[in-house]
C-alpha cells in the first residue's frame, strides 16, 4: 500500500537567483548569502544559489557549503547578461525560484522559469522600487520594464518587502498580488566574544574616536552632505574624531568624495580605507564609536543592523526604513542634508561615552528581538512552503 507523505514533510527545493553574488554587491549580497545559509538549514528546505559571472576563490568560499551555480556573462556589467543561466536553473528541478534584485538579466530568467515550468517565482526588490531608486538611471529601468521586468513582476506569485514602507512602494508600482513583509536578519556576535585586533587607522592615534560609514560609495548614500556637515563642525571637536568612509567605489564616486574632502580642507580627519571584508570589516564595527548612514534611499540597510549587532550607536535618515531604531532610542535621526547632519553630529560627538554606549546597547537588544536570522529564515521558509503548495498562507503575507 502506497504511503502519502504529508505536505508539511515534503522537501521544497528553492533556487535563490541574484546578480549580487560577490562582496561588491553590498547589502543585497550580505542578506542573500545569510538567508540562503539559514534556509538551507531549515527543516524541509533545500537551497541552490544561481547567478551570472565567474567568481574568484574568495567569493566562492563565502557561499560554502551551498551549491553555487553560475554562468559566464556577455556584454556590459550593469545588465549581467548570462545566456547559460536559464539552463542552469531549469536543470536543477526546483519547486520555486526566489529572485533578489531587479532590472538585470536574472529577472528575465525568473520570468522564463515560470513560463517554462508553470512553477512559482518570488521577487525581493531590495528597495529597487522605491521612488528615489526608480528615478536613478530611469531610462534604463524604463527599457527593462518594457522588455521583461513589468511582466516578471506581474507573473510573480508573491513579492517580498523588507518593511511596510517598501510594501507601499510595491503597491504604488502597480503590483496587485500577494506581498510578504519580512525584514533582513543579522548575525549577532556573542557578548563575550573577544574583540578583533584594532585596525591600522586606530594604532597611530588611539585617542581619536571613529565615526564609521561602511557601504557602497554611491550618490544615493548622501556622502557629499556628510562631508559638508563634517566641515561645519567646530575644529576642536573634529580633532577628537575621525570620519572613516569605508566601501567600494561605484561610478568614480570615491574620486569625487576625496576631491571634495580636499577642497573643504577636512582631509586630515577623513579617511577612505577602501572596501572592508571579513576580519577587517568586523574590526571596523567593533572599534568604531558610532555609525552613520545619511542615505537618500534604502530597502532595509544591512550595515545599520550590523552596527547594532556590535552594540554601536547609529545616526541615520528616515529613508533607512528602520523607525524602530528611533522609537527604541537606538538611533539618532538625521535628514539627508548638511545642516541637519551637522547639528546631529555636534550633539552626538559631544555627548559622553556612557550615553553612546547606552544607545548601542539598545540597538543590540533590538536586533536580538526582531532581526535574528533564525526567526527571519523560519518566516521565509513558511512562504516557500505555501508557494510550493505544502502549507497554509503565512501571517506575513497580505493581499490587496
Task: Identify what each model region corresponds to.
Residues 51-56, 186, 214, 242-256, ...:
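Glycosyltransferase donor-sugar binding loop
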Residues 354-369, 379-382:
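A short, well-ordered alpha-helix in the C-terminal region of glycosyltransferases
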Residues 165, 185:
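Carbohydrate-associated surface elements
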Residues 30, 34, 209, 213-232, ...:
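A conserved mid-protein helix/loop that constitutes part of the nucleotide-sugar donor-binding site
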Residues 116, 142-158:
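Membrane-proximal helix-turn-helix segments that form the acceptor-binding/catalytic region
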Residues 313-317:
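Short hydrophobic beta-strand element within catalytic cores of glycosyltransferases
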Residues 296:
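Aromatic "clamp/platform" in nucleotide-sugar-dependent glycosyltransferases that forms part
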Residues 331-339, 347-353:
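Conserved acidic donor-binding segment of nucleotide-sugar-dependent glycosyltransferases
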